[in-house]
């Protein structure tokens, strides 16, 4: 039963994350053209049924994005996208008729900041978390989320460590592992005829993971 609930929450979180980006590309001209077309006929316009208002106890989700720190330029936009997605989901009737509430929290790119925000979100009834953005930050708070049976879905964690961990069904990510990035980088260097290389990386979980994956892939092709 717990696994079914976790899978359902992962699906909902992935839906919200996916809804954070993209647009329909429509224009005001297109809207005006449709309005003119519908006003011209004398026939009765078809009736439309509005989506029912979501009711019942809300599904509480939390957004843990870097609103401070090194990635503060990226976090607010992602958080706003998540808030818009939740607004659109509720306007369409919620999730199976249940409204969605969103708690916005700051993860920084710092485990301590993220843990404080996660603790507050759990106290506020959060059942699922979007985030964190940084691999090291998610690694620092994942055990707490698992212990509370709160699902985490990250849009950007790439550390290979997550693949090997026992996540007990409470973690997923929508970004590929650095192992894949390492293979691609090695292939590009081979195509460019590079024979030797030095690797400089960030001193965090993301940087170390990508550097190790790239070095491993390079060793297989003798660079």
What does each model-identified segment do?
Residues 1-7:
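Bacterial N-terminal signal peptides that target proteins for export
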Residues 17-19:
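C-terminal motif of bacterial Sec signal peptides marking the signal peptidase cleavage site
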Residues 80-102, 220:
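Signal peptide-proximal N-terminal region
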Residues 112, 116, 126-220:
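Extracytoplasmic ligand/sensor domains, especially the bilobed periplasmic-binding protein
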Residues 30-52:
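Extracellular mucin-like PTS domains
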Residues 21-31:
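Bacterial lipoprotein signal-peptidase II cleavage site
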Residues 45-63, 94-99, 189-195:
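Immediate post-signal peptide segment of exported/extracytoplasmic ligand-binding proteins
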Residues 52-55, 59-83, 105-112, 133-136, ...:
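Extracytoplasmic "Venus flytrap"
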């Amino acid at each position: 039963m717990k696994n079914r609930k976790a899978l359902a929450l992962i699906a909902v979180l992935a839906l919200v994350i996916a809804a954070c980006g993209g647009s329909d590309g429509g224009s005001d001209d297109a809207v005006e053209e449709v309005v003119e077309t519908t006003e011209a006929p004398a026939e009765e316009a078809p009736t439309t049924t509005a989506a029912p208002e979501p009711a019942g106890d809300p599904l509480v989700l939390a957004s843990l994005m870097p609103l401070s720190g090194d990635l503060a330029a990226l976090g607010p936009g992602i958080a706003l996208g998540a808030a818009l997605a939740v607004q659109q989901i509720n306007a369409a009737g919620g999730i199976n008729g249940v409204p969605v509430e969103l708690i916005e929290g700051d993860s920084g790119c710092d485990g301590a900041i993220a843990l404080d925000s996660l603790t507050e979100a759990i106290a506020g009834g959060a059942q699922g978390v979007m985030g964190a953005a940084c691999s090291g930050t998610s690694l620092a708070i994942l055990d707490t989320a698992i212990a509370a049976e709160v699902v985490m879905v990250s849009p950007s964690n790439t550390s290979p460590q997550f693949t090997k961990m026992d996540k007990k069904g409470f973690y997923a990510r929508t970004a590929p592992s650095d192992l894949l990035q390492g293979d691609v980088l090695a292939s590009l260097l081979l195509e460019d005829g590079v024979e030797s290389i030095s690797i400089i990386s960030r001193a965090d979980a993301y940087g170390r993971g990508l550097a190790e994956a790239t070095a491993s892939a390079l060793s297989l092709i003798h660079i």
